[in-house]
């Protein structure tokens, strides 16, 4: 993805778990996007389940995809 300063951080709720550590996330601002788990979360075995609140980074280049960076 893009550099840290180019990303948009927003919160949302995981609505569906898809194969290959991909999730469908409903953002607080309205749209639903596809998001994958960041490498550090994968490395530390942080589990994400439907219903979890997460922080997602989105690039301005493709606002339909994102990276989950934090689980609340």
From Swiss-Prot:
UniProt-recorded name of the protein: Translation initiation factor IF-1
InterPro entries in the cross-refs: NA-bd_OB-fold, RNA-binding_domain_S1_IF1, TIF_IF1
UniProt-listed SUPFAM superfamilies: Nucleic acid-binding proteins
Domain of life, source organism: Bacteria
Pfam family of the protein (one): eIF-1a
HAMAP family referenced in this protein's UniProt entry, alphabetically: IF_1
Signal peptide: none
Subunit relationships: Binds to the 30S ribosomal subunit, contacting protein S12 and the 16S rRNA. Component of the 30S ribosomal translation pre-initiation complex which assembles on the 30S ribosome in the order IF-2 and IF-3, IF-1 and N-formylmethionyl-tRNA(fMet); mRNA recruitment can occur at any time during PIC assembly.
Keyword terms: Cytoplasm, Initiation factor, Protein biosynthesis, RNA-binding, rRNA-binding
Cell compartments where the protein resides: Cytoplasm
The S1-like domain, residue ranges: 1-72
Family designation: Belongs to the IF-1 family.
Its job: One of the essential components for the initiation of protein synthesis. Binds in the vicinity of the A-site. Stabilizes the binding of IF-2 and IF-3 on the 30S subunit to which N-formylmethionyl-tRNA(fMet) subsequently binds. Helps modulate mRNA selection, yielding the 30S pre-initiation complex (PIC). Upon addition of the 50S ribosomal subunit IF-1, IF-2 and IF-3 are released leaving the mature 70S translation initiation complex.
Organism: Thermus thermophilus (strain ATCC 27634 / DSM 579 / HB8)
Coiled coil start-end: none
Annotated GO MF terms: ribosome binding; rRNA binding; translation initiation factor activity
Any one of the GO CC terms: cytosol
């Amino acid at each position: 993805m893009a550099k840290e300063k180019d990303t948009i951080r927003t919160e949302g709720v995981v609505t569906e778990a898809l194969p290959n550590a991909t999730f469908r996330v409903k953002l607080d601002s309205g749209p639903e996007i596809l998001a994958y788990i960041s490498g550090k979360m994968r490395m530390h075995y942080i589990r994400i389940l439907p219903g979890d609140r997460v922080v997602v980074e989105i690039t301005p280049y493709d606002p339909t995809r994102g990276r989950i960076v934090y689980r609340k």
